[in-house]
Regions:
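Flexible glycine-rich active-site/ligand-binding loops centered on an Asp-His dyad
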Residues: 85, 135-139
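N-terminal intrinsically disordered, cationic/polar leader segments
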Residues: 1-117, 121-129
Length: 139
């Protein structure tokens, strides 16, 4: 297991004019390769409004699985042109959420350094959609 510096930039497109909400997290993480994928573990912070939570990224060449554990818990799977459904658990209740991955761009080298870029839509309760973008830089 190696230490890594991870920068995660998330953007949520708020309206048709392209206004966005942007959050950037730079954190220390652990990184390992299990023969199939890179596993990145890190702690969330106040910046992400998820302080106390832990996040695990399982990064494959063709998909990424994000598991959040703590008072907010969920498992999100991102694979280009695929949809997945999940339960998002919060202190305020549980919500059904669907994810539709539009773009998945894997640019990691053999040591797991580089970036992963994802664009996806979140569908809440089958009707309300939001476009989201994630850029994960790993060094």
């Amino acid at each position: 297991m190696n230490k890594a510096k991870v920068k995660i930039t998330t953007k949520q497109i708020l309206d048709d004019a392209g206004n966005e909400d942007k959050i950037e997290l730079v954190t220390e993480a652990t990184k390992e390769f299990n023969g199939e994928c890179f596993i990145i573990d890190y702690d969330e912070s106040k910046i992400t409004e998820s302080e106390g939570n832990k996040t695990r990224l399982r990064i494959y060449k063709d998909k990424l699985i994000m598991i959040k554990m703590g008072n907010l818990s969920t498992k999100m799977e991102f694979e280009k042109n695929k949809s997945s459904e999940n339960m998002y658990s919060t202190p305020y209740g549980n919500f059904d959420i669907s994810y539709n991955t539009i773009v998945y761009d894997y640019s990691l080298d053999e040591r797991g350094n580089g970036s992963v870029y994802i664009e996806y839509k979140i569908i809440f309760g089958g009707t309300e959609e939001s476009l989201n973008k994630i850029l994960i830089d790993i060094n």
